[in-house]
Amino acid sequence: MNPTLAVLGAGAKAVAVAAKASVLRDMGVDVPDVIAVERIGVGANWQASGGWTDGAHRLGTSPEKDVGFPYRSALVPRRNAELDERMTRYSWQSYLIATASFAEWIDRGRPAPTHRRWSQYLAWVADHIGLKVIHGEVERLAVTGDRWALCTHETTVQADALMITGPGQAEKSLLPGNPRVLSIAQFWDRAAGHDRINAERVAVIGGGETAASMLNELFRHRVSTITVISPQVTLFTRGEGFFENSLFSDPTDWAALTFDERRDALARTDRGVFSATVQEALLADDRIHHLRGRVAHAVGRQGQIRLTLSTNRGSENFETVHGFDLVIDGSGADPLWFTSLFSQHTLDLLELGLGGPLTADRLQEAIGYDLAVTDVTPKLFLPTLSGLTQGPGFPNLSCLGLLSDRVLGAGIFTPTKHNDTRRSGEHQSFR
C-alpha cells in the first residue's frame, strides 16, 4: 500500500507536489498518494471566497514561476531532464495554450495575471492530474500511532505525513464585532461591494504585501488620509533585481549564511516590504502617511477607534495614542495559526522534538532540508516556515518545483529499492 501525504489546503504548494507526484508515477517511480483537505476549493485564497483578496488584483510574482519552476529536478538519477520536460505540461505557458490565450498574453506584454486567473490556472493543473480533494474544514490535527489524523466535521483523513500550507484564516480582527475595525476578509468583502468605503481617517496595520494590496485597493475609495502602521522605520521596497530574485529560485548558497545574515536578507526582500509597483502608487498619492510602531491596545470610543502604539527608541519604550474612523488589520497571519488545531498529545510530541516550548523562532530553526520539522515523527512539512533555514523562495510561489522535490524526496516516501537489473517499465525508487 502506498504511503499517503495529506496536505492542509489545496493551494499552489499542494498542486505543485501533487503534479510532480503524478508525473513521477507516470514515469514508473514509487510516490505517495497526495490528498488535499480544503474547506472551499482549489486555489481559494486567490479568489474572493478565500478572504485574502477580491481576485481582481495582480499577482506579485511572475506567473512563469509556476508549479514546476525552476525546472531543475534532482529526484530520479539519469531521468531528471525527462521529469522536467514532463512537468512543462502543467506550466503557465501550457495553460495559456490550452485556453487559447497564449498569443494575447504575449501581445499584451506578458502581464501579471489577476489572482482569480492564477487560481484558475491552479484548478486547471489540479483537474488534469486528478488531485484528490476532501472538502471540509479541519477542526483537529492528531497523531494516532505513527500516522496523522486530520479531523473535519464529516470525516477523518489518515496519512503517513502531513504538509500544512496557507496563511490560515483571514477573519482575525483587533476588535471582533466592531464595525469600525475590519479584518482582511471583511475589508475585501466591503471592497467587492458596490458602495465605496467612505471615511476620513483610515489606518492600515501592516507593512507587508497583504497590507500593500489593501492600500492599492483603498486608492479608489473615498478616504481623506491613509496611515500605514508598521514596526519598521519606513516602508521598504522589495528588491526585484537579478541578485534578489536569484535568492528565491536558487537557495544553493543560503546555508552558508549565518542566521543573522539570512534574517537581514529576508527583511530586505520578503517580509514587511512593498512591491515596487505599490510603492510607485504610494509616491503619487499624498493621502498616504506612515507611523512607526506596534499596536499595543485598541478601543472604540466616541465614534472612533483609538490605537495605542508602542515604539522602541533606544532603550526606552514610548506609547502614543491615535484616533481613526476606520482601522483595517492587514498585519497578515499568525505564523503559528495551525497550532490551535493540534491535540495536546501532538503538541507534546512537537515540543519533545523541538527540545523546548513551541515558539515561532524555535519551529523555524528546526525546519530541515526536506522542509519538515526535524526529530518529529510522523513527518510534519511546514514550507511556509522554511524560509530561514532553507531559503526565501520556499514559503511563497518562487520555487514550487524545488519545494516538491524536497517534500517528495523525504526519506519516509522512499520505498525499498528494486534490483538494478529491473526491466524497462518496472517501477523504480528515488536515488
Swiss-Prot record:
Pfam families per UniProt: Lys_Orn_oxgnase
Catalytic activity: L-lysine + NADPH + O2 = N(6)-hydroxy-L-lysine + NADP(+) + H2O
Keyword Oxidoreductase in record: yes
Enzyme class (EC, first level): oxidoreductase
Necessary cofactors: FAD
E.C. number: 1.14.13.59
Induction summary: Induced by iron starvation conditions and during infection of human THP-1 macrophages. Transcriptionally repressed by ideR and iron.
The keyword Coiled coil is assigned to this record: no
SUPFAM superfamilies: FAD/NAD(P)-binding domain (SSF51905)
InterPro entries listed in its UniProt record: FAD/NAD-bd_sf (IPR036188), Lys/Orn_oxygenase (IPR025700)
Disulfide bridges in this chain: none
Signal peptide (UniProt feature, chain positions): 1-21
Any one of the GO BP annotations: catechol-containing siderophore biosynthetic process
GO terms of molecular function: flavin adenine dinucleotide binding; L-lysine 6-monooxygenase (NADPH) activity; monooxygenase activity
Record's keyword terms, sorted: FAD, Flavoprotein, Monooxygenase, NADP, Oxidoreductase, Signal
Any coiled-coil regions, as ranges: none
Pathway: Siderophore biosynthesis; mycobactin biosynthesis
Family, similarity comment: Belongs to the lysine N(6)-hydroxylase/L-ornithine N(5)-oxygenase family.
Purpose: Flavoprotein monooxygenase required for N-hydroxylation of the two acylated lysine residues during mycobactin assembly, thus producing the hydroxamate groups necessary for iron sequestration. Is also able, but less efficiently, to hydroxylate L-lysine (non acylated) in vitro. Shows 5-fold preference for using acetylated lysine over lysine.
Name of the protein described by the UniProt record: L-lysine N6-monooxygenase MbtG
Species for this entry: Mycobacterium tuberculosis (strain ATCC 25618 / H37Rv)
Gene: mbtG
